[in-house]
Structures are given as C-alpha cells and as structure tokens.
C-alpha cells in the first residue's frame, strides 16, 4: 500500500491533472488539483484572477491552498505549473509527500495546450516560445523538488500512471527517503 501523499509537479500540459485523477482512482486516494481548488473557492477562473490580481496575487492564493492541501492525508495533488516558484511550496511538498515531476518537451506541451484558453501565461503572440522560456526557468526547480522524474511524451495516461506506481512501489514498508531514486522514462521520438 502506498501510505504517503503523491504530489505532481511539472509544466502546464504535462498531464498532472489527468494522470493525477487516474492515480487517485487506482490507489484509492483522494484527488485534488490546486488550480481547481482556487477556482472553486474564489468562484472565478484563473484568467480572471490574473486579470484582477496579477500573477503575484494568484501565486499568493496558490501558496495558501497548497499549504492547506498538503496537510491532508492519502491524497494525490496536481499542482499548478508555477507552484514550484515559491520556496515555501517546494518545502511543503518535499516534507509532506513524494514529489513526481512529469516532464514533457515544449512541442508536446504546446500540442496539449494550444486550444486551451484557460492558460493566461500562454496569451501571447508565440505560445511555443513562452512554453520554452517557462520550462527553462522552472525545470531546475521541478528537478530540485522531485523524488521521481517521469517523461510523459506521447505515452497514454495509463502507461504514465503505471510507471509512476512502479517507481513508488519500490519503496516498501512506509514512507520513502527523499531523493532515494530518480527515474527518467525514455521516450524516443517524443
């Protein structure tokens, strides 16, 4: 049994919400998405929060939500792509569960996000270039906090979730030691 929380980090479009829901279902854990929690509690969408409060206002809300959610037990939490920007979020995630970094290359992220109007940071003339810049800035932070790194590429949700579980099951008898393993799933052609 996986008796620890699973926290998913990674760029927008890496599959955190989709894979997180699937992981929660097959492990019997409760699923939370920090962005959806923010929307639910404010009653408005993320783009509206960005319009009214700017990115800094949104990040403050995100820190509060993450600090609250990581106190729960038996959960899978999909964080927003920029959650790792705040040192307190990285600390909270590291201390309260196992952090899985879902990595995908920028072109794959672009294909997954290009038709989603709910992503204020991609409202730019060149969303692919913006994704590349965001990944360059955030990748070191994702890697810093990650216990496990999984390359999602073009793999189906079930395959990625099963790879996450395979890695997590290597820990037997309680919560794992941080940084005990890191695995990058190769996916040639992605």
Curated annotation (Swiss-Prot):
NCBIfam families: PRK05057.1. Catalyzes the specific phosphorylation of the 3-hydroxyl group of shikimic acid using ATP as a cosubstrate. The keyword rRNA processing does not apply. ATP binds at residues 13-18, 119, 155. Monomer. Pathway: Metabolic intermediate biosynthesis; chorismate biosynthesis; chorismate from D-erythrose 4-phosphate and phosphoenolpyruvate: step 5/7. HAMAP family: Shikimate_kinase (MF_00109). The gene is aroK. GO terms for biological process: amino acid biosynthetic process; aromatic amino acid family biosynthetic process; chorismate biosynthetic process. It is found in: Cytoplasm. Keywords: Amino-acid biosynthesis, Aromatic amino acid biosynthesis, ATP-binding, Cytoplasm, Kinase, Magnesium, Metal-binding, Nucleotide-binding, Transferase. One of its GO terms (cellular component) is cytosol. This is Shikimate kinase. Binds 1 Mg(2+) ion per subunit. CDD domains: SK. GO terms for molecular function: ATP binding; magnesium ion binding; shikimate kinase activity.
């Amino acid at each position: 049994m996986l008796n620890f929380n699973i926290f998913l980090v990674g760029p927008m479009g890496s599959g955190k919400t989709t894979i997180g829901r699937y992981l929660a279902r097959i492990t019997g854990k409760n699923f939370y998405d920090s962005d959806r929690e923010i929307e639910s509690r404010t009653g408005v969408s993320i783009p509206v929060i960005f319009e009214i409060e700017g990115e800094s206002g949104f990040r403050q809300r995100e820190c509060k939500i993450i600090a609250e959610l990581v106190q729960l037990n038996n959960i899978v939490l999909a964080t927003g792509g920029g959650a790792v920007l705040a040192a307190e979020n990285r600390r909270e995630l590291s201390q309260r569960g196992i952090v899985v970094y879902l990595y995908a290359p920028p072109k794959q992220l672009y294909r997954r996000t290009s038709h989603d109007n709910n992503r204020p940071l991609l409202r730019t003339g060149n969303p692919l270039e913006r994704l590349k810049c965001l990944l360059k800035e955030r990748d070191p932070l994702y890697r810093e906090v990650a216990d496990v790194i999984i390359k999602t590429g073009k793999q189906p949700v079930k395959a990625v979730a099963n790879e996450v579980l395979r890695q997590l099951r290597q820990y037997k008898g309680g919560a794992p030691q941080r940084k005990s393993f890191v695995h990058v799933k190769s996916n040639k052609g992605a």
